């Protein structure tokens, strides 16, 4: 069986772009159990409530939902268990210094397979206030309306 190549997206966190101001992004590997990989290959995962945090000098992904593998047996994984993120030491140090600043957190943006290996894209993020969210929605609506008006003018 030939190896997979390219990027196959399993799950995206669309809510993160609405809830946070996103900064630097990093690609991290995931330390997974076999049944988790099989469940991901079926395209089953949810990143909505996920976040990453440091325990000691290691980075862990928490609250990401990967449901149990349907054909799994007694050795199935726990759906919301903590999963270790695999990054280079220099990246870990850089991220840890940035997350110590007030208000910064790490959120997963995308979970995918790259050349057969499970990867997660995490971003350094700062929470938006309610008025920021409303302002962003208002701006998106204004651009949609202006594009619609331009299209009608050009067609009509």
Curated annotation (Swiss-Prot):
For whether the record's keyword set contains Cytoplasm, the answer is yes
What Pfam families does the record point to?
SmpB
Keywords for this protein: Cytoplasm, RNA-binding
Select a single GO molecular function from the record's annotations and give it: RNA binding
Q: Where in the cell is it found?
A: Cytoplasm
One of its GO biological process terms is: trans-translation
Primary localization class, coarse: cytoplasm
Q: Which CDD domains match?
A: SmpB
| Annotated Gene Ontology cellular component terms | cytosol
Q: Does the keyword Lipid metabolism apply?
A: no
The record's listing under InterPro entries reads: SmpB, SsrA-bd_prot, SsrA-bd_prot_CS
Role this protein plays: Required for rescue of stalled ribosomes mediated by trans-translation. Binds to transfer-messenger RNA (tmRNA), required for stable association of tmRNA with ribosomes. tmRNA and SmpB together mimic tRNA shape, replacing the anticodon stem-loop with SmpB. tmRNA is encoded by the ssrA gene; the 2 termini fold to resemble tRNA(Ala) and it encodes a 'tag peptide', a short internal open reading frame. During trans-translation Ala-aminoacylated tmRNA acts like a tRNA, entering the A-site of stalled ribosomes, displacing the stalled mRNA.
Sorted alphabetically, which NCBIfam families does this protein's record hold?
PRK05422.1, smpB
- Family per UniProt? Belongs to the SmpB family.
Q: What is this protein called?
A: SsrA-binding protein
- What is the phylogenetic placement of the source species in the record? Bacteria, Bacillati, Actinomycetota, Actinomycetes, Micrococcales
């Amino acid at each position: 069986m030939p190896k997979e190549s390219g990027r196959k997206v399993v799950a995206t966190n669309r809510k993160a772009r609405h809830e946070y101001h996103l900064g630097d992004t990093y690609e991290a590997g995931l330390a997974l159990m076999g049944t988790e990989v099989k469940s991901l290959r079926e395209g089953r995962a949810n990143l909505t409530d996920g976040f990453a945090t440091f325990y000691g000098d290691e980075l862990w992904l928490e609250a990401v939902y990967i449901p149990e593998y349907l054909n799994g047996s007694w050795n199935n994984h726990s759906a919301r268990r903590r999963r270790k993120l695999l990054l280079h030491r220099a990246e870990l140090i850089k991220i840890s210094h940035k997350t110590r600043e007030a208000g910064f957190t790490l959120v997963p943006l995308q979970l995918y397979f790259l050349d057969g290996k499970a990867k997660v894209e995490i971003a350094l993020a700062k929470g938006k206030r309610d008025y920021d969210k409303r302002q962003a929605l208002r701006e998106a609506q204004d651009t949609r309306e202006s594009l619609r008006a331009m299209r009608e003018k050009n067609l009509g």
